[in-house]
Structures are given as C-alpha cells and as structure tokens.
Swiss-Prot record:
This is N-acetylmuramic acid 6-phosphate etherase. GO terms for biological process: 1,6-anhydro-N-acetyl-beta-muramic acid catabolic process; amino sugar catabolic process; N-acetylmuramic acid catabolic process; peptidoglycan turnover. InterPro entries: Etherase_MurQ, Glucokinase_regulatory_CS, MURQ/GCKR, SIS_dom, SIS_dom_sf. Pfam families: GKRP_SIS_N (PF22645). Homodimer. It catalyses: N-acetyl-D-muramate 6-phosphate + H2O = N-acetyl-D-glucosamine 6-phosphate + (R)-lactate. Transmembrane segments: none annotated. CDD domains: SIS_Etherase. It comes from Salmonella agona (strain SL483).
C-alpha cells in the first residue's frame, strides 16, 4: 500500500502555514479543523449502533469487549477499557485494551511493534480468546498489520469483529463484520493521527462502551448506578444519584446506602418500593440487574 495516498497522510491545504501563524491564529486553525470531527462521526452512526448492539450481545453471552491497536489508537483503547470498572462496576478484564508492544508502549513508543500480524494474533491467544468475545480493531490508517492479524484471527475463531479507521475502504474494514470509518480529512499537522483521527476514535469508543453498558443494565435514566463508590467524591456522587432518582432527602439516601454498602441500585429500589436491602438485591438479580425492569415489574 502507498501510504502517501491515504487521506490521513495527505497534506491539509488549510494548514500549510502553521509555522508562520501567531499563537491565537494557530489555535484557531486547529479548532476549525476539530469542528469537522463530530460531523464525520455522525455519518458513521448506523455502523456505531451495530457495534453497540454487538458489544452488548457479547457481554450478555458471557464474552468480553477487546480493543486492539498500536500507538495512539492502542492507547485510546486501553484508556476506554480502564475506565469501565470504576464507571460501571464491571470486573477488570471484561473490557480489555491491547496495545502493540505491550503495556510499556503506553508510555514510550515501541518501534516496529505494529508491523507484525503474528503479534496481533499472539496477544489474542494469550487472552484465551473465546467466540463470545467482541474484538474491536483500531487503526487511524486502517492498515496496521498488528490489527489486521488480530482481526483475522478473531474472525477465524468465530468472534464478531469491528474495525475503526479514519480512511475509507481500509484493509482493516475488509477484515471486520462491522466497519466504522469516520473520514476526518487530512490532519492539521500532516500525518499526525493523534489529532482529528484520535478524537474521532475516542468519540466512537465512548459510544460503544457506554452504549453497551446501558444495554447491559449498568445505567438507570442517565445515572451510572453500578458505579463503585471507592473515594469521597464517589460516595458523594452515590448519594446525589439516589436523591435525584427518588426525590428523597440526602440524610435518608445516606442511611439507605449504608445498608447496601453504598451500592446505588438497591438503594434506589429500596427508596421507591419499601423493600429491604436483601429483597432489593434479590429483585434486581431476578431482572438481570436492570433497575428499570425491577421497578416496573
């Protein structure tokens, strides 16, 4: 592949004079480019919705969401995966981020790590990949060998696969069941895909993980009701969620949360139904953890 022909590698005619601009002009030019990212992502929403449903289906069948990428793309996957346990109360390992070159590549580039298809396969083998898992390959260029190797192995293993790239009709898109390709255009700094391409990928990952968790029963209304209250700020947030979801006072909310070890869902159910903590947990379990269903049935 001639990398110079990729949209993400071409020069942007609107930013050819970066080194001659004043600082206010420079940041304005970057901001003007960034405004195009949301529109590019908007054009991919039907495919993002398919990926959300596939991610939710993986979780409901006992599988995992596995992100894999190199460089910026890999770091974004690791970032999104690492936020899921504290935000949604899921176990570490339910959402996984793989980066070419291993954990050390998060802080320091590992040269050449992305160039091996076998490394992508090997990293999935090391995770004991199962057919219930969803594998999401991330590559702004759409041609990273590490990601291609991983997606190919995942499909051969019976997994549903998703490709996220910022170039149209990319090689990783051809390896995946679902292709999400927000074409953000040439970067303000030629080839620096940590810019618009990275922003677009982050927006897509936000929707995939959050959407999947909504459909996995981790959200009530727009509240993260399975959040783990592990510090002072989060204990306060747990109290506010119970107050906002039920209309009870702060003191009563704190009393209920102490009875549930600061688990928000059973505290809300107790406030709205009069159940005790054990009965609230039992009812939630009967409805697979979906608070709305437990309240309505």
């Amino acid at each position: 592949m001639n990398l110079g022909t990729l949209v993400s590698e071409t020069r942007n005619p609107q930013t050819m004079d970066l080194d001659a601009l004043s600082t206010p002009e420079l940041v304005k030019r970057f901001n003007e480019q960034d405004t195009r990212v949301a529109e590019a992502v908007k054009a991919t929403l039907p495919d993002v919705a398919r990926a959300v449903d596939a991610a939710a289906a993986a979780l409901k069948s006992g599988g995992r969401i596995i992100y894999m990428g190199a460089g910026t793309s890999g770091r974004l996957g690791v970032l999104d995966a690492s936020e899921c346990p504290p935000t949604f109360g899921v176990p570490h390992g339910l959402v996984v981020g793989l980066i070419a070159g291993g954990p050390g590549a998060l802080l320091k580039a590992v040269e050449g790590a992305e160039d091996s298809q076998q490394a992508g396969e090997d990293d999935l083998v090391a995770l004991n990949l199962q057919e219930q898992d969803l594998v999401v390959g991330l590559a702004a260029s759409g041609r990273t060998p590490y990601v291609i190797g991983g997606l190919r192995y995942a499909r051969q293993s019976g997994c549903t696969t998703v490709a996220v790239s910022c170039n149209p009709d990319s090689p990783i898109a051809r390896e995946a069941n679902i292709a999400i390709s927000p074409v953000v255009g040439p970067e303000a700094l030629t080839g620096s895909t940590r810019l618009k391409s990275g922003t677009a990928q982050k927006m897509v990952l936000n929707m995939i993980s959050t959407g999947a968790m909504v459909k996995f029963g981790k959200v009530y209304q727009n509240l993260m009701v399975d959040m783990k209250a592990t510090n002072v700020k989060l204990v306060d947030r747990a109290c506010r969620m119970v107050v906002e979801a039920t209309g009870i006072g702060r003191e009563e909310a704190e009393t209920l949360l102490k009875q549930t070890d600061f688990e928000v869902k059973p505290a809300i159910l107790m406030a709205l139904t009069g159940l005790d903590a054990a009965a609230a947990r039992e009812k939630l379990a009967a409805h697979q953890g979906f608070l709305r269903a437990a309240l309505e049935h």
